[in-house]
Regions:
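Bacterial N-terminal signal peptides
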Residues: 7-18
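Short, aromatic-rich amphipathic segments at membrane interfaces
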Residues: 175, 198-228
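Juxtamembrane interface at the cytosolic side of transmembrane helices
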Residues: 235-248
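Membrane-proximal low-complexity regions enriched in glycine and acidic/polar residues
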Residues: 81-177, 181
Length: 248
């Protein structure tokens, strides 16, 4: 038995006895509740696993797992070409765009939930509430933001990312890239049957800076002048050292 399946079986055996699963509809857990961003952080994989109530089991049941990060303001600029030179053109600012958003499901979202339900639940990239600050909303800026975040692996959809084991157990793997920002994250699990959400659960996840990375961030924000001087000094020293080595 693979490790994810073993975890799922252990979860089912332990929680089915200790918790009234019938009342909740779904039980779930994360492989870790905290992700530490260190100096050499290259990303982290998060395992989401759980089980649905017996009365919800069956081929008509689907599971959707999403992970959302803290909101952050983002400016999207359009490049324009003038006299053969590319320059910054019109821009649009999104005040509260998710810094990270990933969603996985047992089947493509459009076959699980109607477009109206996806908009209401804000599930899927097309249904994210991305509202620009400007008076006139240009859909090209919204799509450009989604494309940019997707290329950075900060946005993503996996239409078959949730795996079912038997009729009740499920698990999904979500990847947090190195560019994620610290803060509170939330995992949402939806159990869908016949186009309706019949059970749900949310789990908190925290991304924190740790070690040297945390100290550098603290100095940069608490003592920006000292940080700037140190950065200039280190850059100058690196340049001098490089010239000496190449001279030899």
């Amino acid at each position: 038995v693979s490790a994810p399946v073993a975890w799922l079986l252990a979860l089912l055996a332990t929680l089915a006895v200790a918790t009234p699963l019938r009342a909740q509809g779904v039980l779930a857990e994360l492989s870790q509740r905290e992700v530490a961003v260190t100096t050499g952080f290259a990303g982290a994989e998060l395992l989401v696993f759980g089980t649905t109530a017996a009365e919800l089991a069956g081929p008509e049941t689907d599971v959707i797992v999403s992970l959302r990060g803290p909101n952050a303001a983002v400016v999207v600029r359009r490049k324009v070409r003038i006299a053969g030179i590319w320059l910054n053109g019109p821009s649009e600012q999104f005040e509260a765009a998710p810094s990270f958003y990933a969603v996985s499901s047992t089947r493509p979202l459009e076959t699980v939930l109607s477009a109206e339900e996806r908009r209401r639940l804000r599930i899927g990239l097309a249904s994210l509430p991305l509202s620009p600050r400007g008076q006139i909303e240009d859909p090209t800026f919204r799509q450009a933001l989604i494309d940019l975040k997707t290329s950075q692996r900060l946005f993503g959809e996996d239409p078959e990312g949730v795996r079912l084991v038997g009729d009740r157990l499920f698990h999904a793997r979500l990847f947090l890239p190195s560019a994620v920002i610290p803060g509170p994250y939330r995992v949402d699990i939806l159990v869908v049957r016949d186009g309706r959400v019949v059970a749900s659960r949310d789990l908190p996840l925290t991304v924190v800076r740790a070690g040297t990375s945390a100290e550098i961030w603290r100095v940069a924000h608490d003592q920006p002048l000292a940080y700037g001087i140190a950065a200039v000094f280190l850059a100058a020293f690196a340049g001098w050292l490089g010239s000496v080595l190449f001279r030899r």
